[in-house]
Design a protein with these regions (language model features):
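Bacterial Sec-dependent N-terminal signal peptides
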Residues: 1-22
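N-terminal low-complexity, Pro/Thr/Ser-rich intrinsically disordered segments
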Residues: 21-39
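Conserved beta-strand hairpin/beta-sheet module of binuclear metal-dependent hydrolase folds
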Residues: 33-86, 165-178
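Short, hydrophobic/aromatic-rich segments at coil-to-beta transitions
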Residues: 42-48, 141, 150-152
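Hydrophobic/aromatic beta-strand patches that form the interior of the parallel beta-sheet core
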Residues: 47, 93-95, 115, 136, ...
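Metallo-beta-lactamase
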Residues: 68-70, 76, 150-157, 161-238
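Active-site HxH/HxHxD metal-binding segment of metal-dependent hydrolases
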Residues: 76-146, 238-241
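C-terminal regulatory/interaction regions
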Residues: 247-261
């Protein structure tokens, strides 16, 4: 099945929404750096990698006592498997927040298996045409046990049908890909779906004290907060009611139907 890549319905600019000051984890000394990616440390067992091809596409290395998870693989990072092996000696499990070129680019070919949300399976032939490894499907609500550390899988459709957020309840943060926090939201589904996703995430953040969601394009100060998730609910409801209307721009719309700010 051929799927139109970037079948975007709307672009929600979220940069002006209320959010508290945040510590940047990109200011310290890099633990790894080359021309394609830079890794900085978030805490003792968590790192963020910043690619340089598509708006600072971000990948995250999350380590437990038994294994580590690599969340996303960037656009095109040569020898990514060898790079992460210089940071952790634990076996690596590759998971994807969603199947788009800047998150499941050519570096996925270096890994024997990848875990994705089945909602994005139709994107695989176009986005990962040369991947020969095993593609395994995540289950909503499952826990990935890394040994002394767990990530809960939360399906968060909106940016894509198979967008996924990974929540570390004990650390009080998560990793949301482009579902939340990337400075804007490219929405490929309807606003009712987005509202349901945001309401679910808001409840999770409230119940478990989740302070931040690290996004798929991290600039140091744009980790998503509960307040901004709630703001997205309000904005989406205003769009549905007609209180807020999108507009077409005269410049290049990059395939977008409307811009909503």
């Amino acid at each position: 099945m051929k799927v139109k890549f970037y079948a975007i319905a709307a672009f929600i600019l979220c940069s002006d929404m209320a959010a508290p000051a945040q510590q940047s984890f990109l200011d310290g000394e890099a633990v790894f750096k080359n021309d394609e990616v830079v890794f900085h440390q978030i805490d003792e067992h968590t790192w963020v990698g910043t690619g340089n091809l598509v708006y600072n596409e971000s990948l995250y290395l999350v380590e437990g006592t038994e294994k580590a998870v690599l969340i996303d693989a960037g656009t095109r990072i040569k020898d990514l498997d060898k790079i992460v092996a210089t940071i952790t000696k634990k076996p690596i499990m590759l998971v994807a927040t969603h199947v788009h070129n800047d998150h499941t680019g050519s570096a996925v070919d270096r890994f024997p298996e990848i875990y994705i949300n089945p909602g994005d399976k139709d994107y695989i032939p176009q986005v990962m045409p040369r991947y020969k490894g095993n593609i395994k499907f995540l289950t909503d609500g499952e826990e990935i046990d890394l040994g002394g550390r767990k990530l809960e899988v939360v399906f968060t459709p909106g940016h894509t049908p198979g967008s996924t957020t990974f929540i570390d309840k004990n650390a009080a943060y998560g990793f949301s890909g482009d579902s939340f926090g990337s400075g804007n939201l490219l929405l490929s589904m309807d606003f009712s779906t987005l509202i349901a996703t945001c309401e679910r995430m808001s409840t999770i953040m409230e119940n478990y004290g989740i302070k931040f969601l690290f996004p798929g394009h991290y600039y140091g100060n744009n980790a998503e907060t509960k307040q901004r998730v709630d703001d997205m609910i309000t904005l989406s409801k205003d769009v549905i009611s007609g209180k807020v209307k999108g507009e077409k721009k005269s410049n290049d719309m990059m395939g977008l139907n409307l811009v909503i700010t």
